């Protein structure tokens, strides 16, 4: 029953509005007119309609504007001295260039704002059983019926002014909502650009960190190779000194026998050669070093 009454009240509202409009146009100059009555279907009127689509004015980032910026940042390497056979000092620098491109764009969409609705009427029903076959029913409720007010106070002209004021309020609200949406969009675009720039700087820092780690590993391997070469040279020097000392302290002996048969007879020549070495050296800590070497003595025996 309530839905059927609501449909009937809605049809009465539309028919009465049409009759009021036709009466106002057909009887211009006369004193009689048809009163417009508005019956609400939900017990309370709605202000400004159910929903409104608010247009947002375009901003500075409504189109794609690509930015291009060349960032040059170089690093200087410390001077290093590598002793191979001749001291060599190398000075170097690395120039690294990053090309940053980017843009910020906002795809605008219509802002849909729901209009407030006046609360539905409140009804309460209390059924009391008093005993002895007696009963009492109490009904209480609150409602706002705009049609009663219009029957008493509003004519067609006043209702038209009321509708014009409602539309003006709606347009002003749409304009204010569009300006607030544009301001919020600018804040979002500014924050998005800031986040993008922070991530771009992080990209450059990541490259520099990777380069630094690789250089540290190369330097460590170079120091390991130098240390290994140093110990290899030390071992080779020890072997060379041991071989030299063995040669210097070695002893050798050779026996020589010569026998010649000739027409005049037999000639025999015998001999022996013995070689020995004894090295002695004295080292003093100071500006000079004195080394004494005992030369090899050779003995030859002839028989």
From Swiss-Prot:
Coiled coil region boundaries: 170-257
Keyword list, A-Z: Coiled coil, Cytoplasm, Repeat, Stress response
Segments of skewed composition (Polar residues): 270-280
Compartments, as annotated in UniProt: Cytoplasm
Positions of region (CAHS motif 2): 221-239
Keyword check for Transport: no
Cellular component aspect of the GO annotation: cytoplasm
Biased composition (Basic and acidic residues): 294-303
Region of interest: Disordered: 1-67, 270-303
CAHS motif 1: region residues: 184-202
Compositional bias per record (Low complexity), positions renumbered to this chain: 1-19, 282-291
Main localization (coarse): cytoplasm
Keyword field contains Phosphoprotein: no
Similarity annotation: Belongs to the Cytosolic-abundant heat soluble protein (CAHS) family.
Comment field on protein domains: CAHS proteins contain 2 repeats of 19-mer peptides designated as CAHS-motifs that comprise each two octapeptides connected by a tripeptide.
Function (record text): CAHS proteins are cytosolic heat soluble proteins that seem to contribute to the anhydrobiosis in tardigrades, but their specific mechanisms are yet to be identified. It is possible that protection during anhydrobiosis might occur via the stabilization of vitrifying small molecules such as sugars, but not via the direct glass transition of CAHS proteins themselves.
Name of this protein: Cytosolic-abundant heat soluble protein 3
Gene source species: Ramazzottius varieornatus
């Amino acid at each position: 029953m309530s839905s059927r009454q609501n449909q009937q009240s809605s049809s009465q509202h539309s028919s009465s509005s049409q009759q009021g409009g036709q009466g106002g146009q057909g009887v211009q100059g006369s004193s009689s007119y048809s009163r417009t009555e508005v019956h609400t279907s939900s017990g309370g009127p709605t202000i400004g309609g159910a929903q409104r689509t608010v247009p947002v004015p375009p901003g500075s980032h409504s189109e794609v504007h690509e930015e291009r910026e060349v960032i040059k940042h170089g690093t200087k390497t410390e001077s290093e001295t590598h002793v191979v056979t001749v001291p060599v000092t190398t000075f170097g620098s690395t120039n690294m260039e990053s090309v940053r491109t980017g843009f910020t764009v906002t795809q605008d969409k219509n802002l849909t704002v729901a209009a407030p609705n006046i609360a539905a009427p409140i009804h309460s029903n209390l059924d009391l059983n008093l005993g002895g076959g007696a009963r009492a029913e109490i009904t209480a409720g609150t409602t706002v019926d705009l049609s009663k007010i219009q029957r008493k106070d509003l004519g067609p002209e006043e209702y038209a002014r009321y509708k014009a004021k409602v539309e003006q309020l709606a347009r002003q609200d749409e304009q204010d909502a569009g300006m607030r949406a544009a301001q919020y969009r600018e804040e979002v675009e500014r924050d998005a650009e800031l986040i993008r720039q922070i991530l771009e700087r992080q990209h450059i820092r990541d490259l520099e960190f990777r380069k630094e780690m690789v250089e540290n590993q190369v330097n460590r391997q170079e120091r390991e190779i130098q240390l290994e070469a140093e110990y290899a040279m030390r071992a080779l020097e020890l072997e060379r000194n041991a071989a030299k000392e063995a040669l210097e302290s070695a002893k050798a002996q050779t026996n020589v026998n010569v026998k010649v048969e000739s027409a005049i007879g037999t000639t025999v020549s015998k001999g022996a050669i013995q070689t020995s070495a004894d090295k002695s050296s004295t080292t003093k800590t100071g500006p000079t070093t004195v080394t004494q070497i005992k030369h090899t003595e050779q003995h030859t025996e002839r028989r």
